[in-house]
Amino acid sequence: MIDHLVIYSDYACPFVHNVAIWLDNLKTKCGLEVSVEWKPFMLDQANSRNETGTNIWDIDDLTKPRSLLAQIAGLAAKRQGQNKFETFHLNILKSKHGSGKIFKLNDWSNILLVAEQSGLDRDKLELDMKDEGLREEIGNEHTNAVKNHGVFGTPTIISDGKNAGYLKIFIPPIEQSLEFYNNFISMNSAAPFLGELKRPQPPWPIGLNN
């Protein structure tokens, strides 16, 4: 069984939220131990024609891009330990996509509030976020994702170190979560001949409520 995943993600993406909740359910409610390495990918960069020649991660004003501030905060949170990062990562996604309230990822007060709620040292986080190396890391991860795996959207999951799969889902019911995980891993890793499986929209996702 695959027990390590690399996932390219953008906090602005609701399907990243759904995958994160699904994986958390697998761990906390299904007893499946899977390590997840979350890596930043900038949807604003992928969807931009970049007419100015400036990459999203090089923009000076962190309040302009949708999620650059949150991505930098995520990398800074990793410096306080994997457990605290995972808590922060999940809480940011829940705040943005699961709270039913408007939550701007480019608002410093929002980021710092979630950081405190996640048990992070706020002063250290703010200091680490000033490290320009984090912007460079975001740029490198995004560029490598495109170059090495052809990543175009989020979440894209690397399940065996080489085969990438873009996964767009609603949150699976708990009783189906483990079976779906095994099925996805099997298709992503053992069926390299599969290029795309996509439901017509509509009728999907009519009838689903999450």
Regions flagged by a language model, labelled:
Residues 1-25:
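Local sequence-structure signature of Cys/Sec-based thiol-disulfide redox active-site neighborhoods
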Residues 17-110, 183-187, 191, 195-208:
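Structural alpha/beta surface segment adjacent to cysteine/selenocysteine redox centers
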